[in-house]
Structures are given as C-alpha cells and as structure tokens.
Amino acid sequence: MKNSLFSILLFLLLLGFLTYADISFKNLCSGVIERCDDLEENFNFYTKEERFESAMEIFNLIENKGSIASIYINHIDYDVMLNEALKLTIYIENDDSSESEASLHLLKFSTEHLKDLQVPNIKNIF
C-alpha cells in the first residue's frame, strides 16, 4: 500500500510539473512572438537605440524565463532561440539591417514552430 501511494504521488507531481512547464513555455513563446511582431512592424521607424533595446528585451526574456523551457523542451531548441536573439542584438548594434530582419524573422518563426510542437496531434507524434 505504501508503494502504491508513493507511486501515485510521484505520478501526480510529474503531471503537475509537466503542466506547469507547458504553460510556462507557451507563455514564453507568446511573449517572444509578441515582441518580435512589434519589432518587425516598427523596425524602420525605430532608432538604432530603440531597436537594440527591444532586441535586448527579447534576449533577456528568453534568458530569464527560459530555465523551465531548457528542462522541458530539447535543450538544443532552447539554445537556438537564445543564440538567434543574441545574433539579433549584434546585427542591430552593427547596423546590419538585412541580417537583423532575417534574424528577427527566423527567431519569430522558430519560436512559433516550437510553440506549435507543444500541441498534441498526430503530426507531432509521428
């Protein structure tokens, strides 16, 4: 009886952590996508400092709220998001607008893709 209760408790803890991690990761992705959309729409209207500040917000968001994400998803996918956000800040700092826009779009697309992978369906299972 003791082993059964321990197993049930462990299962419920695992289920709770997975639910929390999934919600946390989806919120992170939504925040990154919103900030990328804002930066994409206003890229030509922002000054260099505003673009850099916005890119740093994206980078800091991924870095600060990504501790659960790095455990929950494949660590390589999280590293790709973080590295792309870092490249975005460097491209903006060096006034490379074409690479900045490409990096921004890639960050947004990969984040949307990772968020879509969290929805259970036949495509994601096989």
Predicted regions and their residues:
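Hydrophobic membrane-insertion alpha-helices, especially the h-region
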Residues: 6-20
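Short helix-adjacent coil turns
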Residues: 39, 43-51, 92-95
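Structured, soluble extracytoplasmic/luminal domains of envelope-associated proteins
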Residues: 76-124
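Positively charged n-region of N-terminal signal peptides that target proteins for export
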Residues: 1-3
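Alpha-helical transmembrane signal-anchor/signal-peptide segments
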Residues: 25-42
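Alpha-helical transmembrane segments of multipass membrane proteins
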Residues: 15-16, 39, 88
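Extracytoplasmic/periplasmic/luminal assembly and interaction segments
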Residues: 51-91
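A ubiquitous short alpha-helical element
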Residues: 17-27, 68-76
